Amino acid sequence: MADTIWYTRCPVPTASGIAFQRDMFADEFDGSDYDVRNIKELGKEKADSHFNHALDNCFREGGSIPPLWAKQGGADTVMVGLTFLSDAICFYVRPDSDIKTMQDLKSKRVAVGVRPYIMIDFMKINGHKAWDCGLRAHGMTLDDVELVEVEINDDMHSHINPDPKTGEKPPGTLMFQNELDALNRGDVDAIWVKGCQTRQMERELSGEIRLISDLLYDTDNPELKVNANPRIITVSGNIARDNPDAVVRYLQVLIRAARWSADQPRDSAQILATELGVSLSDINGAFVENYQNKLWPNLSAETMHLLSTQQDFMLAHDYLPGEVDLASWCDDSFLRKAYERENLTWAA
């Protein structure tokens, strides 16, 4: 009987999502000692493993905040890859607002959604960092605005690993609905939204919100585009130690998915739009140009540096009680071997 490799992914563009939608894991591991399955099959009682990485034999690809938090807390994980894909980070006001630019936010109230029920409130950190970067990109700081917490009681666990094949849909603009409601009530003067939800919201709420800045276009500084990215590929320590070949084979699948995405950009865009629960036009306008060619796993010095800026922010604002040694957490031997087996140049 085959052992199970569990995987989990965030609702963002990932090679894991493409591989899952195209049955590439099944193709690679068919007839092997492993069966690759979605942690969603384990039910809600195991859903937190997406955040704390407490499940053995598990791979995760997604936002950087939970893996950093879990590792600092003692999770037995290995970082085996990174990707960096800039996405829209947008700031909106009401259409009748006298706020025209980011500089007009001086002394204004800006929304940060908070979810007290979740073990690591990554969206609060995302919001805090989005405002930090958005203001810095326009010569301001967090001291220039009032951060207003908007409490949210949704179910983030339901957003983990949606399976479009079964009709499940990712959260879409619902992830920012509470902040939007606060804006419309007048509780805050501005909100932030990221990723393909920006274009979806602009399309669905045309005339009801007004964009004042988008960091995808308003800054060339990659450090100011870091918001839950670089995405991290982590694996449970037990499988890295006990069956390194399985880790290499898993990464080979991600490399193949990244190559397919680069070679078939139109098909890739459609798969990712389905994966994220948005239209094709939404996804094509929400990410850096040629985003379909940005899913290659790597551990380059540049991407590692960008990850360090995410950690620095978390440390500075007490979201991490201590520093993760990124160099010792990272093991590039698996990814090097995977590229070698695929006869491709190591993407360092």
Task: Give residue spans per PLM region.
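Short, glycine-/small- and polar/acidic-enriched structural segments
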Residues: 3-158
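Short, solvent-exposed loop/beta-turn-alpha elements that line the ligand-binding surface or hinge
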Residues: 26-30, 217-223, 294-302
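Pocket-lining segment of extracytoplasmic ligand-binding domains
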Residues: 65, 156-159, 163-271
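Conserved C-terminal helix/tail region of periplasmic/extracytoplasmic solute-binding proteins
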Residues: 312-348
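Short glycine-centered helix-capping/turn motifs at secondary-structure transition points
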Residues: 18, 22-23, 186, 294, ...
